[in-house]
Amino acid sequence: MAAKGARMIIHLECTECKNRNYTTEKNKKNDPDRLELKKYCKFCRRHTIHRETK
């Protein structure tokens, strides 16, 4: 049987309002650190930093 893939589903949480706005996948072998992206938050109505949560 084939091994389970290295990709895992993560959630991105706004650092200002703490809402989980985005869901994405990441390869834990290529990116072992926590993902941090600047994305639009519809609750804050502006671009904020979103950090990875599980």
Curated annotation (Swiss-Prot):
Pfam families: Ribosomal_L33
GO BP term, pick one: translation
InterPro entries the UniProt entry points to: Ribosomal_bL33, Ribosomal_bL33_CS, Ribosomal_bL33_sf, Ribosomal_zn-bd
SUPFAM superfamilies reported in the protein's UniProt record: Zn-binding ribosomal proteins (SSF57829)
Domain of life, source organism: Bacteria
Keyword Secreted appears in the UniProt entry: no
UniProt-recorded Gene Ontology molecular function terms: structural constituent of ribosome
Keywords: Ribonucleoprotein, Ribosomal protein
Cystine crosslinks: none
A single cellular component GO annotation: cytoplasm
PANTHER family named in the record: 50S RIBOSOMAL PROTEIN L33, CHLOROPLASTIC, LARGE RIBOSOMAL SUBUNIT PROTEIN BL33C
Similarity-based family: Belongs to the bacterial ribosomal protein bL33 family.
Designated name of the protein: Large ribosomal subunit protein bL33
